[in-house]
Regions:
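Short Lys/Arg-rich cationic patches that frequently serve as NLS/NoLS or arginine-rich RNA/DNA-binding motifs
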Residues: 1-9
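A structural signal for multi-pass alpha-helical bundles of membrane permease subunits
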Residues: 8-318
Length: 318
């Protein structure tokens, strides 16, 4: 009996060896640097003296940090619901197209099967294309569209000679407008973020939709359930595990919007799009490592609390 237990333990032990490289990688590139950031947040950068929570107090009282935190929160609250809802709708439509293709295949309707599969492939290419575009190319696109001499201003001036809406636009737009330096900049940022990461969320939703057994839908159809009831009582409940992952990854991806804004507007953009990453970048340039460390710890704490609360609410509803 002891020999058998010893053999079982021997078989189980190799699993830890496979996990060891991952654990070392996370420790070296994640846990240890973060621990150093936490340590630096309690010390002054210049002389290395211990200052307690003084850095945290300075960060909270900083007007730039306050503005950036409000803008970032506003950006996340605006973007995430739009992104989740739009990506879910498009993923469900795409899934329906693939289901129709499978039905046509069963009925040996080759022409319609190829049509539906071609449509699905075209849709996939459309929503995955923005993910493949580099940030620098997105910046060029922004400048072409929203610069004072860009496409939007040219289109409005072209319409100004027409009746109706053209006259209204000509009154509102007397001169060329740099849209990235107006209140419209926030809306442009939201639109570009949703456009950029829509395909990422669609892929995640598609993975969840593909995991739902088709037999459930067939049984519901035989029982007389309509499309809406099938959606609310079968599709959405089965997507709950995927929804948790999509929400978390979408929130984390929302912090990547800084690159495009920085390339277009620099370190001090229009107030509506001045995000937390701008504060970190400016503090890094002035070597305010202590403030930057304190702000990073606070941000990590807020994200961790958000994830834990979301996970707990998910578990309660299940």
């Amino acid at each position: 009996m002891r020999m058998k237990r010893h053999k079982i333990r021997k078989k189980r032990n190799p699993g830890w060896y496979f996990l060891l490289p991952e654990f070392l990688g996370v420790s070296v590139f994640g846990l240890i640097p973060f621990a150093d950031v936490v340590r630096r947040s309690f010390f002054q950068t210049v002389d290395g003296s211990f200052v307690g929570i003084s850095n945290y107090v300075q960060v909270i009282k900083n007007d730039a940090f306050d503005l950036a935190a409000k803008n970032t929160l506003r950006f996340v609250v605006t973007c995430i619901p739009c992104l989740l809802l739009l990506s879910l709708i498009l993923a469900m439509l795409l899934q329906q197209v693939l289901i129709l293709a499978e039905k046509k295949k069963k009925h040996r309707d080759v022409t319609m099967e190829q049509f539906y599969r071609g449509s699905a492939a075209a849709l996939k290419s459309m929503y995955l294309l923005p993910m493949a575009i580099p940030a620098a190319s997105v910046v060029v696109l922004w400048k072409i569209l929203f610069d004072s001499h860009g496409f939007v201003n040219s289109a409005i001036h072209a319409l100004s000679g027409m009746n109706g809406i053209g006259k209204i636009l000509s009154v509102l737009l007397v001169r060329e407008v740099d849209w990235m330096n107006t209140d419209a900049a926030f809306g442009i940022l939201v639109f570009s973020y949703v456009w950029k990461y829509l395909g990422y969320d669609i892929v995640l939703w598609m993975a969840g939709l593909s995991a739902i057994p088709q037999g459930i839908y067939e049984a519901a159809e035989m029982d007389g359930a309509g499309k809406w009831k099938t959606c609310f009582y079968i599709t959405l409940p089965n997507l709950r595990p995927v929804a948790f992952t999509v929400v978390i990854l979408s929130v984390l991806n929302s912090f990547k919007a800084f690159r495009e804004v920085y390339m277009v507007a620099g370190s001090y953009p229009q107030e509506n799009i001045y995000l937390l990453q701008h504060v970190f970048s400016n503090w890094f340039q002035t070597l305010s490592v202590d403030k930057m460390a304190a702000a990073s710890v606070m941000l990590a704490f807020v994200i961790a609390v958000f994830v834990l609360l979301l996970e707990r609410s998910w578990e309660r509803e299940e």
